[in-house]
Regions:
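RNA-binding accessory domains that recognize and position tRNA/RNA substrates
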Residues: 1-51, 55-60, 69-71, 87-234
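Short alpha-beta junction capping motif
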Residues: 61-81
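Catalytic nucleophile loop
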Residues: 81-82, 221
Length: 234
């Protein structure tokens, strides 16, 4: 099944890390810029949206956030994008609160996304706690200071204001759960799947004719030449 999740790039390093984690678990994701309109995401056939932001403590600039919400697609907002989601839903943010050491984060393991996950911890110099009316959201990630994660009411939409980490099992579990349990994606993305897909696209573009492949000497063009040869021969 050729399903995919779209990762909206709001912070380069955070976006790359999340995309790498998803692909390592064999879930296909496509990275798009924050200027990508909701209708473009729908045309891709995406099953879900991940907003990949950093953790600066300021709400991220997400130009089409309301449009994304109106698609009805499942959405996972991470880092500063969760602060933006909170405000968009009518919530409020605390002033930055300095943190002394790691924050112990209590998770509601009964939530469909968290799926039995155990409590975790995060180190951030400061935190901004989110506040939403009970009718708007359910807290699912909290510390003694307040709410750091929520599930929006009547929507498959989640926000976590803390960062996901590269070598953290919780981060991988969260992303996989979003793709598998919420979006209904299958783990089909492998090296062979990439090769097969590229061969099909090249063969379709050539349409039974010939094709010219120009080599620059770089890795990308070399890979393209190999794929072209696999698809239509010499």
């Amino acid at each position: 099944m050729q399903d995919l999740v779209v990762v909206v790039n709001l912070n380069g390093s955070a976006c790359r890390m999340m995309a790498q984690k998803l692909r390592a678990e064999h879930y296909y994701c496509r990275i798009v810029s924050s200027a990508c309109a909701a209708e473009d995401i729908q045309r891709m056939g995406a099953r879900g949206i991940v907003l990949a932001a950093g953790v600066s403590g300021e709400a991220a600039d997400v130009p089409f956030l309301m449009d994304y919400l109106q698609t009805g697609l499942p959405m996972l907002c991470v880092g500063d994008s969760a602060l933006s989601l909170c405000q968009t839903l009518g919530g409020e943010l605390s002033e930055p609160v300095p943190q002394d050491g790691a924050m112990q984060i209590h998770l509601d393991a009964s939530d469909a996304l968290l799926d039995g996950m155990e409590d975790t911890d995060r180190y951030q110099p400061t935190a901004r706690f989110m506040s939403l009316d009970d009718a708007q959201a359910t807290p699912i990630a909290t510390t003694d200071g307040g709410m750091l994660g929520f599930h929006a009411s009547r929507r498959d939409v989640w926000g976590f204001s803390f960062q996901l980490e590269r070598n953290d099992p919780f981060s991988s579990h969260l992303l996989v759960s979003f793709c598998q349990n919420i979006c209904g994606c299958t783990a089909w993305w492998t090296n062979q799947a990439l090769i097969d897909r590229a061969r099909e696209e090249i063969d379709r573009a050539a349409n039974g004719g010939s094709a010219l492949c120009s080599l620059s000497g770089g890795i990308d063009s070399g890979v393209c030449a190999v794929l072209g040869n696999l698809a239509i021969g010499h």
